[in-house]
Amino acid sequence: VAGCKGNPHCTNCHNPESWNFDIGDLYNEVYFEKIKTKVQDFDNMITSIQIFGGEVNDQNYIELENMLKDLKTLNKDIWIFTRYDLKDCPKFELELCDYIKCGRYVQELSCDNNLQYGIQLATSNQKIYKKGLDY
């Protein structure tokens, strides 16, 4: 997902190229079909679809909701990575996503012992929430 309104942006962001809203391809039916084909071709190897960027929650919510609805039809866990708190995530995201990683990257809080749901998080302020368990 391209585009991040971070103000300020995270120091040492893992993907500063994604801050620009004008890069990448627009999500549409053709793009979804490409994703669907890849997931079907590698079905036995793919357990989840992870969405990060940029900032997922700085996007057009109508387009984001449509994308999540499409992806949900692929019967894979949907992960969203956001700098925002869970309380700031839109309702449709809570309903359609299986996991939501919250918390911006804060270099001063870097750590190597924040393992949650099989994902090593970069800083101690980050948390992963699982649908049905944590929200």
Region locations from a protein language model:
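Canonical Radical SAM [4Fe-4S] cluster-binding loop centered on the CxxxCxxC motif
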Residues: V1-E29
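Flexible loop residues that form catalytic
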Residues: S18, G54, R104-Y105
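Canonical radical SAM enzyme core domain
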Residues: N20-K36, N57-L94
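Conserved glycine-rich "GG(E/T)P / GGGxP" loop and the immediately following alpha-helix
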Residues: M45-D70, Q116-G118, G132
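Hydrophobic faces of well-ordered beta-strands that scaffold small-molecule active sites
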Residues: I49, I78-I80, C102
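Classical nucleotidyltransferase
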Residues: D88-Y135
